[in-house]
């Protein structure tokens, strides 16, 4: 079987594999927020940046080739990831102690793995609406990191197209495909993949807030880098 080098470890891969796919199959953690094994490629967050043959690339969109040398967990790359995470934190409302997703949040867990101890940048303090119109699901747009997972899940898995992305630059935002732009008039169901795939606390089910006590939450038990490959990507 063909192999490539990932942080000096020889990793087997199949034809057409991306660096992310081959690494995850081999049990190697590549930090990510917008990648999911059940969805197509996106490259939206760039947290999975690696150095392949001395070029910076996204691990989730770059196909691996034989004898490629990939650098993943280096001080340089983790520093770049930490800067990206800090920008995501200050752009939205990510006050972890007050968020129901705390302890189960992929953004929070990845920041901890990258050694993020402060925000570094000045906070934006956005004032975006909360949509609680749906009977079972609510959205806090201030927490959305524009990973597009809900958009892609709704299109690719649910076949509904409930979500989309609109606007440009700092005004880029999540859209709801309904006559009113509200969730209650959309085709979203509580059991849709799009309703449960959010890696942060932007899309959450109602009536189950703070279900798990501190110490018993997902990433309290197992740090994100030590989970079984794909476990942190499971759709609940």
Where are these regions (language model features)?
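Aromatic-flanked redox-active Cys/Sec active sites in thiol-based oxidoreductases
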Residues: 8, 36, 139-142
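Fe-S ferredoxin-like electron-transfer domains
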Residues: 46-47, 55-236
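N-terminal cofactor/phosphate-binding cores enriched in small/glycine residues
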Residues: 11-66, 80
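Eukaryote-biased recognition of intrinsically disordered, low-complexity regulatory segments
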Residues: 1-9
């Amino acid at each position: 079987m063909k192999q490539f080098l990932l942080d000096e470890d020889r990793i087997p891969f199949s034809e057409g594999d991306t660096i992310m796919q081959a690494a995850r199959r081999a049990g190697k953690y590549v930090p990510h927020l917008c990648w999911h094994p059940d969805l197509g490629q996106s490259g939206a967050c760039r947290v999975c940046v690696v150095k392949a043959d001395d070029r910076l690339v996204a691990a989730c969109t770059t196909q691996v080739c034989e004898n490629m040398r990939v650098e993943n967990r280096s001080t340089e790359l983790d520093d770049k990831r930490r800067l990206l995470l800090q920008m995501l934190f200050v752009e939205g409302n990510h006050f972890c102690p007050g968020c129901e997703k705390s302890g189960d949040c992929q953004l929070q867990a990845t920041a901890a793995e990258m050694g993020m101890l402060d925000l570094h940048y000045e906070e934006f303090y956005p004032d975006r609406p909360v949509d609680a119109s749906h009977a079972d699901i609510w959205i806090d747009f201030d927490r959305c990191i524009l990973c597009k997972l809900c958009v892609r899940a709704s299109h690719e898995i649910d076949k509904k197209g409930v979500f989309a992305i609109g606007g440009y630059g700092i005004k880029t935002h999540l859209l709801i495909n309904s006559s009113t732009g509200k969730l209650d008039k959309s085709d979203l169901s509580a059991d849709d993949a799009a309703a449960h795939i959010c890696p942060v606390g932007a899309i959450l089910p109602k009536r189950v807030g703070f279900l798990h006590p501190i110490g018993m939450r997902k990433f309290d038990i197992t740090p994100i880098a030590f989970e079984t490959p794909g476990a942190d990507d499971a759709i609940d």
